[in-house]
């Protein structure tokens, strides 16, 4: 199963699990939507994975730990102050049932990580559909390198960003790449999804290579110019 639970204004809490196994939860901006879904569907939770320390990804950790005191909360060191109990390192994270690759995707924050499990990429605020996160650290090289790392994943990788930013990102992508037909076509599909309050996510790495300016950018100079332009778009 793969489920994006809407939270706050435009966040998603992602749930992933194989058939008849406990699920993993990725980021938790608030607790109640998660609890409601888990109780309604009678799910067991194996782990909570945090991508970075921002409140709109961690504000539900405290209540989560109260309700699920035996479930480990994984995250980079910067999330320890927000309630992470297990600090992740780059490489392999093994839970009871899941073999998870931890990927360094710093730039949005100093220690932002992404998680790859069974061909599903949970990338927090590093990679969005048709966009990427703001570079709050000022380290554009880290951000560019992290996105290149994600870009190297197979085209059929299922990409699960943490925010419903796709329409706004596509508007900028059209501005930067006005001749890109794939962007125009995908925008039409996303508009139909959003009119009926359906998510535009997940996406795929293959699609993002076609429509995402920050993956299309061939060099650091172009990436930085486009990212700074998006900041004020």
UniProtKB/Swiss-Prot annotation:
SMART domains: Lactamase_B. Its cofactor is Zn(2+). Coiled coil: none annotated. Its EC number is 3.1.2.6. One of its GO terms (biological process) is methylglyoxal catabolic process to D-lactate via S-lactoyl-glutathione. It catalyses: an S-(2-hydroxyacyl)glutathione + H2O = a 2-hydroxy carboxylate + glutathione + H(+). GO terms for molecular function: hydroxyacylglutathione hydrolase activity; metal ion binding. Binds 2 Zn(2+) ions per subunit. SUPFAM superfamilies: Metallo-hydrolase/oxidoreductase. Thiolesterase that catalyzes the hydrolysis of S-D-lactoyl-glutathione to form glutathione and D-lactic acid. This is Hydroxyacylglutathione hydrolase. The lineage of its organism: Bacteria, Pseudomonadati, Pseudomonadota, Gammaproteobacteria, Pasteurellales.
């Amino acid at each position: 199963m793969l489920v994006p639970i809407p939270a706050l204004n435009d966040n998603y809490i992602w749930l992933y699990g194989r058939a008849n196994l406990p699920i993993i939860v990725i980021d938790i901006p608030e607790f109640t939507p998660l609890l409601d879904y888990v109780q309604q569907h009678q799910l067991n939770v194996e782990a909570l994975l945090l991508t970075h320390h921002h409140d709109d990804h961690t504000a539900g950790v405290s209540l989560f730990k109260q309700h699920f005191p035996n479930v480990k909360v994984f995250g980079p060191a910067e999330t320890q102050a927000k309630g992470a109990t297990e600090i992740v390192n780059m490489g392999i994270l093994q839970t009871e049932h899941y073999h998870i690759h931890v990927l360094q995707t710093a730039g949005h924050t100093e220690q932002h990580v992404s998680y790859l499990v069974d061909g599903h990429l949970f990338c927090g605020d590093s990679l969005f559909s048709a966009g990427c996160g703001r570079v709050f650290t000022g380290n554009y090289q880290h951000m560019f390198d992290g996105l290149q790392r994600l870009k190297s994943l197979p085209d059929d990788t299922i990409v699960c960003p943490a925010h419903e930013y796709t329409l706004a990102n596509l508007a900028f992508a059209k501005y930067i790449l006005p001749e890109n037909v794939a962007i125009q076509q995908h925008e039409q599909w996303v508009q139909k999804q959003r009119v009926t309050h359906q998510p535009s996510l997940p996406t795929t790495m293959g699609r993002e290579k076609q429509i995402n300016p920050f993956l299309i950018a061939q060099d650091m100079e172009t990436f930085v110019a486009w990212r700074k332009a998006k900041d004020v778009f």
